[in-house]
């Protein structure tokens, strides 16, 4: 299956309304990942089909959970997942991509420029040291244990905001280790077309 058809079929199976222009931009992002990966080691994946599944479709499972947001922070953004696909599909949301690795943030800045993502800001640094970002939604994909994630980012969450942590298998142990002042709003299993591995999203808020 041609890559454009594979992406379109995956999106159709998942349900979000994503324009042809946005889909083309998502594939252009994959091209940038492949180009920069040779030097910067942004992803262990080399196969384009796997990139579409793991980096695009997997990231797009976040979209229903940022519907009401105006601002989003992607912590430990790495090669830009889920932040860049989210930014492509939600140009109305101001998205900050944060990573401590300067090579990765250099890529993220270039990707935002080349993809024309005016709604993206890139911040280089450790999350604990960042103080000039506030977001309605703070998200991450496989960044850290939940207790650490909320502890390190609580100062970056707006009042009334929430965390959206993208995880693999159901993180029962991690949920049990969350601090008492954090409320588990929802744990939802995610279906990613073409991906056999388990995926869950954990929605958390301050009590």
Swiss-Prot record:
It comes from the Bacteria. NCBIfam families: rsmG_gidB (TIGR00138). PANTHER family: S-ADENOSYL-L-METHIONINE-DEPENDENT METHYLTRANSFERASES SUPERFAMILY PROTEIN. It is an enzyme of class 2 (transferase). S-adenosyl-L-methionine binds at residues 76, 81, 127-128, 141. The gene is rsmG. It comes from Neisseria gonorrhoeae (strain ATCC 700825 / FA 1090). This is Ribosomal RNA small subunit methyltransferase G. Specifically methylates the N7 position of guanine in position 527 of 16S rRNA. Its main location: cytoplasm. Its EC number is 2.1.1.170. It catalyses: guanosine(527) in 16S rRNA + S-adenosyl-L-methionine = N(7)-methylguanosine(527) in 16S rRNA + S-adenosyl-L-homocysteine.
């Amino acid at each position: 299956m041609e890559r454009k058809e594979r992406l379109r079929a995956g999106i159709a199976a998942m349900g979000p309304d994503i324009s042809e222009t946005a889909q083309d931009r998502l594939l252009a992002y994959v091209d940038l990942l492949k180009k920069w990966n040779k030097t910067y080691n942004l992803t262990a994946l080399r196969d384009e089909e796997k990139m579409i599944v793991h980096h695009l479709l997997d990231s797009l499972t976040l979209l229903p959970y940022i519907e009401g947001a105006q601002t989003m922070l992607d912590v430990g953004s790495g090669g830009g997942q889920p932040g860049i696909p989210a930014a492509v599909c939600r140009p109305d949301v101001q998205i900050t991509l944060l990573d401590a690795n300067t090579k990765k943030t250099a890529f993220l800045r270039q990707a935002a420029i080349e993809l024309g993502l005016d709604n993206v800001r890139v911040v280089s640094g450790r999350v604990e040291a960042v103080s000039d970002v506030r977001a309605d939604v703070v998200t991450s994909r496989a960044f850290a244990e939940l207790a650490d994630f909320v502890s390190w980012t609580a100062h970056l969450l707006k009042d009334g905001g929430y965390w959206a942590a993208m995880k693999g298998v159901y993180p029962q142990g991690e949920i049990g280790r969350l601090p008492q002042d954090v409320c588990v709003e929802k744990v939802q299993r995610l279906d990613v077309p073409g991906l056999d591995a388990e995926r869950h999203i954990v929605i958390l808020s301050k009590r």
